[in-house]
Amino acid sequence: MRNINGEILSKNSSFEVNGKSNTLGGVLDFNSKNEKLNATLKNIDIQELSTMMNYPKFFDAKANLTFDYDSLLKKGNFNGNLLNGHFIENSFTTLFNQLSKEDLTKEVFETFDINSKIDDRILTSNLNMKSQNTQISIEDSILNLEKNLIDSKINAKIKDNSFAIALSGEALNPKISIDLKDLIKEKIIKQLEKKKKKIRKIA
């Protein structure tokens, strides 16, 4: 983070800090008043953010983020909107590509919204992503930052293929399980449709 420009205000028992800084390829604005912190990050680089947080790079995009937190209650909200991004090749995209027979890294996501509730060191998140051919959603994903544990179910659809991927255990190296019921069901339906067409031609 580069130099922060701002001001410090102190009156009676109230203490307030306002600041602005160029960071992560974008701009940080924040206000901290007593136990409450409000911050916005505009047009930041997600790859730079991943590096700063010591997480593997998995997505390339610019993002607008808001963060509200009460340090006394240890509760807050984190919301983000990523702009026209795409996945970087990783273990998740490799698995996704094997299941869907499509290349996820070539999909450009016009919509990528994430909303998280913070309760002490636990984040509960919902995520929605959409591109021309792909839709990915996550509901009530749990990330325990203190224990570095994750419990999440990813619902994915690319073109006519649907499946679910569950992540559990260590956040940086989670156990992965796959629910292929919808994918198998769709393949069976396609096979039945092909057989129906052949029967019609013979008839």
Regions found by a protein language model. Give the residues of each.
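Exposed regions on extracellular, virion, or secretory-pathway luminal proteins
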Residues: 1-2
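Small-residue helix/turn framework positions
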Residues: 5-189
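Short, low-complexity, Pro/Ser/Thr/Gly-rich segments in the mature regions of secreted, periplasmic
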Residues: 192-203
